[in-house]
């Protein structure tokens, strides 16, 4: 990937800022998400809650299923590959996917190395729990970062923890003297130029979304309050009682997160929320995959 292409991919991801990206498993769900105002959809055969419940090895979705969703909507379509699975990423690029998510939700294919995303033209999304993880993924070519959170739980606590951790570490890096950034980069295990960018600009060089456990308009507003530039919603919409209404409410809450009166109205009569899993009840911690 050329420097110009890398810059283009980062700019494409910037266009999603302030939006909501929704997990969908069928063309019908994709249309609901698009009608609700989603800025993109994530096409996958099973949403994270079902992946967690079923157990076993989870892999890239069937390309035919992904193509069906691509044909159903005009907004960008993302799809997931396993961490380190170069061949899955090549397949998704071959079917003209808009974004690839190298995702801890799926079973990792490589427990040491991530995909060299600089070898691809399609932009990549990657998860991170802290600043070091985020900058390492960006060094590998990621055009967009999201918190890992804990997918499929409906519990936002880990997404909150990861966003707070990342932003705290950014503030700490900004506060350093110029000659202290070298040591900080070494401790974070990241390239100096990326650490210097954060030090000088007070933010990541790519867009940073929240993901993992967002299930209500209030959850989305909370993540925006904490510095997210947009929100991924997985199981929280189509595992709820009224997906269309909840999807539209979360989109509006993300765009108007500072308007408490509107948030109160958006939170009314949404139907039953997804049945969640508390952090201390989780058996498999997906966020620990791919550091």
From Swiss-Prot:
Q: Answer yes or no on keyword Lyase.
A: yes
Q: Which UniProt keywords apply?
A: Lyase, Pyridoxal phosphate, Schiff base
* Annotated D-glyceraldehyde 3-phosphate binding sites: 164
According to its UniProt record, what is one Pfam family this protein matches?
Answer: SOR_SNZ
Q: Which reaction does it catalyse?
A: aldehydo-D-ribose 5-phosphate + D-glyceraldehyde 3-phosphate + L-glutamine = pyridoxal 5'-phosphate + L-glutamate + phosphate + 3 H2O + H(+)
Task: Give any GO molecular function from the UniProt entry.
Answer: pyridoxal 5'-phosphate synthase (glutamine hydrolysing) activity
Q: Which residues bind D-ribose 5-phosphate?
A: 23, 152, 213, 234-235
Q: Which residues form the active site?
A: 80
Q: In which pathway does it act?
A: Cofactor biosynthesis; pyridoxal 5'-phosphate biosynthesis
Which EC numbers characterise this protein's activity in its record?
A: 4.3.3.6
A single Gene Ontology biological process assigned to it is:
pyridoxine biosynthetic process
Which purpose does this protein serve, as stated in its record?
Answer: Catalyzes the formation of pyridoxal 5'-phosphate from ribose 5-phosphate (RBP), glyceraldehyde 3-phosphate (G3P) and ammonia. The ammonia is provided by the PdxT subunit. Can also use ribulose 5-phosphate and dihydroxyacetone phosphate as substrates, resulting from enzyme-catalyzed isomerization of RBP and G3P, respectively.
Q: How does it assemble?
A: In the presence of PdxT, forms a dodecamer of heterodimers.
Q: Which family does it belong to?
A: Belongs to the PdxS/SNZ family.
PANTHER family referenced in this protein's UniProt entry, alphabetically: PYRIDOXAL 5'-PHOSPHATE SYNTHASE SUBUNIT SNZ1-RELATED
The entry's protein name is Pyridoxal 5'-phosphate synthase subunit PdxS
